[in-house]
Amino acid sequence: RAVLPAHHFDDDTKDVIKLGMGLVATMTALILGLLIASAKGSYDTQKSEVAELSAKVIFLDRVLARYGPETKEIRDLLRGSVEREIDRVWPKDHARAPELVPGGSAGIAFIKIQELSPKDDAQRSLKAQAFSILTDIQQTRWLMFVQRGSSFPMLFLVVVVSWLTMIFISFGLFAPRNATVIATLLVCALSVTAAILMILELNTPFEGLIQISPAQLRDTLMVVGQ
């Protein structure tokens, strides 16, 4: 501010800058809201897929249990598969990145189900149902993998940060230098930073501060194989 000539701070110049920054602030608010909505939508989709996966695993176990005791090996395989998937997607070692690529247990389960020899129509129906559920489980698991990426182009976030930088520069251009103004600008900056952090966290649902809980899949271990 001290570097600019005095005529840059007359009333007309201030009015034009305020109008321009008002337009930029409006666009920034709109884009920021869209980014939050997009990230939240992606997060909720992944969360619902985890819940759906948990329900289908339990349903598959119940179908296999109704088939008969000859499915005990498949049910144990299913339980072990769930335990491994939990460890791969939510590793106890936080230094490890989540592995969202589905493991190979489903292929083994398909083979084991194929080897079943139904003795009546009821078992044939249950075998076909087990195949269908296992296919749905694999489809959901691959959906989790392909949807793991960013729900929006990162260029959007770069543009928003650039606009916010311009807005805060305009605030500092005409604001008096006192503790109240500085504190206010800091609070505003922290609020905007929190919004951007929320976007980034929601965009990585299996790691970070705001991550999807594995509790639903862990709950399946209380049922599967029992």
Locate predicted features.
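Structured inter-helical modules in multipass membrane proteins
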Residues: Q46, F59-G149
